[in-house]
Regions:
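Helix-loop junctions at membrane interfaces in 12-TM secondary transporters
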Residues: 50-62
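A late C-terminal transmembrane helix in Major Facilitator Superfamily
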Residues: 89-118
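Helix-to-loop junctions at the C-terminal end of transmembrane segments
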Residues: 18-31, 116-117
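Residue-level signature of mid-helix packing/kink "hotspots" within the transmembrane helices
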Residues: 12-20, 102-106
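Loop-to-transmembrane helix entry
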Residues: 1-14, 93-96
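A membrane-interface helix-boundary motif in multi-pass transporters
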Residues: 111-133
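Structural signature of the two symmetry-related core transmembrane helices
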Residues: 33-48
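Intracellular juxtamembrane helix-capping segments at the cytosolic ends
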Residues: 70-85
Length: 147
């Protein structure tokens, strides 16, 4: 279906400006605040996905992608760099991103598939949006522990 490819194309294109503006955003805002913004936006995006049945609205909701994946990658790299010992920074980046990308690529489709079959797509999207809430709470905890 052309709408599926439009959604993924738009989503990918919208990420590019955020990657390009990454260093500016990190200078202007703290990594944890950007990460909190990402968690909120992912939560809202998934809740709105769950509440709509119109494929055109789903495509429009891809605008939220500007604030999600690119910010998560940029800020997580910065945070890992900051907390890693100097000698382990490269390895830390590699391991953390492997866990982040590989772990989520394994766990989320498995959980989403199971939930979709058992509770339906819309409820699955709502449940998955809770991961954004969990992430937000963990970011607040990390911020508290760093102070």
């Amino acid at each position: 279906n052309s709408q599926i490819s439009l959604k993924w194309s738009l989503q990918s294109l919208l990420e590019i400006p955020t990657y390009l503006a990454g260093s500016y955003l990190l200078k202007k805002y703290s990594s944890l605040n950007l990460l909190k913004l990402s968690a909120i936006m992912i939560t809202v995006q998934f809740l709105l996905f769950a509440l709509t049945n119109d494929s055109n609205i789903i495509i429009i909701l891809c605008v939220f992608q500007v604030f999600s994946t690119p910010l998560i990658l940029i800020t997580s790299k910065r945070l890992i760099f900051e907390v890693s010992p100097k000698k382990l920074r490269s390895s830390s980046q590699l391991i953390a991103l492997s866990i982040f990308m590989g772990g989520s690529s394994l766990i989320i489709p498995t959980v989403a598939g199971f939930l979709s079959i058992n509770i339906g797509y819309n409820y699955t999207l709502m449940v998955l949006s809770l991961f954004g809430c969990l992430a937000y709470c963990l970011i607040v905890l990390l911020n508290y522990l760093q102070e």
